[in-house]
């Protein structure tokens, strides 16, 4: 158990009946890069039950934040959803992950393409001042089924632009593009379809993606990663083949292989 920190739950927020977020204490020894994940878990029958979770908070915050789906029969999520303030949670000491700035070649626009709780690492990315130093525009696309699943929308549109240190950069550079597939909404449809048709780019006022200007990170279900990668490939972008070898776009490989 020495490779685990024991943290304490500070707060829990239920977005709807399928999604929730929680904040925990953070051991000062835990250092991570924006976009990375850790293993988190609970002790079940005397043994740690751990799963990979992206860190949704920026690396300078004193707490950790996680964004999770509720799976009624999921071994861990069925328990995590009942967390309350003061409960203990185990967090691995070694963060890792492929969604890191250094593995992207320099570019003008950064697309953060996510569905569901796949937005978690990008919440960390859009709170990192380095993101705005590297790019002229940062486009956060969040695809969900129902409007109630657009977690963090108020934080992204109202709180973050007022950040005392880099709020002006957010106002100038961050484009938030929420998408809903199963009920009426201003942006409707699947992001891959809207990218292929060009509508997504028209809506945000940027040209279609090209390998000279555009970089991307993708996080979502295995099928979403596969389909979105195919669209980026068709635009001429090349994936980073492995950690430490930069490319035009990145996917979180850890979640693909599960």
UniProtKB/Swiss-Prot annotation:
Conditions for induction: Increased transcription under iron starvation.
GO BP annotations listed: cellular response to oxidative stress; heme catabolic process
Residues annotated as domain FAD-binding FR-type: 2-102
Positions bound to NADP(+): 144-145, 181-182, 190, 223, 227, 255, 257
Positions bound to FAD: 51-54, 67, 69, 76-77, 117, 255, 257-258
PROSITE patterns with a match to the protein in the record: FAD_FR
Domain of life: Bacteria
EC number: 1.18.1.2
The UniProt record lists the keyword Nucleotide-binding: yes
Keywords: FAD, Flavoprotein, NADP, Nucleotide-binding, Oxidoreductase
Catalytic activities: 2 reduced [2Fe-2S]-[ferredoxin] + NADP(+) + H(+) = 2 oxidized [2Fe-2S]-[ferredoxin] + NADPH
Cofactor: FAD
GO MF annotation terms: ferredoxin-NADP+ reductase activity; nucleotide binding
Enzyme class: oxidoreductase
Bound cofactor: record note: FAD and NADP(+) substrate form hydrogen bonds.
InterPro entries: Cbr1-like_FAD-bd_dom (IPR008333), FAD-bd_FR_type (IPR017927), Flavoprot_Pyr_Nucl_cyt_Rdtase (IPR001709), FNR_bac (IPR033892), FNR_nucleotide-bd (IPR039261), FNR_type-1 (IPR051930), OxRdtase_FAD/NAD-bd (IPR001433), Riboflavin_synthase-like_b-brl (IPR017938)
Family, as annotated: Belongs to the ferredoxin--NADP reductase type 1 family.
Function: Transports electrons between ferredoxin and NADPH. Provides electrons to heme oxygenase (pigA) allowing anaerobic heme degradation. Provides electrons necessary to reduce and mobilize Fe(3+) in a heterooligomeric bacterioferritin (BFR) complex to Fe(2+). Reduction of Fe(3+) in a pure FtnA BFR does not require Bfd. Reduction of Fe(3+) in a pure BfrB BFR does require Bfd.
Subunit structure: Monomer.
Protein name, UniProt field: Ferredoxin--NADP reductase
Gene field: fpr
């Amino acid at each position: 158990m020495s490779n685990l920190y024991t943290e304490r739950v500070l707060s829990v927020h239920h977005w709807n009946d399928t999604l929730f977020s929680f904040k925990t204490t953070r051991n000062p020894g835990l250092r991570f890069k924006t976009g990375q994940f850790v293993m988190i878990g609970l002790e079940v029958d005397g043994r740690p039950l751990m799963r990979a979770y992206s860190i949704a908070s920026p690396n300078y915050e004193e707490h950790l934040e996680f964004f999770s789906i509720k799976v009624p029969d999921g071994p861990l999520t069925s328990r995590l959803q009942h967390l309350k303030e003061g409960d203990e949670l185990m967090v691995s000491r070694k963060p890792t992950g492929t969604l890191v700035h250094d593995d992207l070649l320099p570019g003008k626009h950064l697309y953060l393409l996510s569905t569901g709780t796949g937005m978690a690492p990008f919440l960390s990315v859009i709170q990192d001042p380095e993101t705005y130093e590297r790019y002229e525009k940062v486009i956060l696309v969040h695809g969900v089924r129902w409007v109630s699943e657009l977690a963090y929308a108020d934080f992204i549109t109202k709180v973050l632009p007022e950040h005392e240190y880099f709020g002006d950069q957010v106002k100038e550079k961050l484009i938030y593009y929420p998408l809903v597939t199963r009920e009426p909404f201003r942006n409707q449809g699947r992001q891959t379809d809207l990218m292929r048709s060009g509508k997504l780019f028209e809506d945000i006022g940027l040209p279609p993606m090209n390998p000279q200007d555009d970089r991307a990170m993708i996080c979502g279900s295995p099928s979403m990663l596969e389909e979105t990668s195919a669209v980026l490939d068709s635009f001429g972008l090349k994936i980073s083949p492995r950690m430490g070898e930069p490319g035009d776009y990145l996917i979180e490989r850890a979640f693909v292989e599960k």
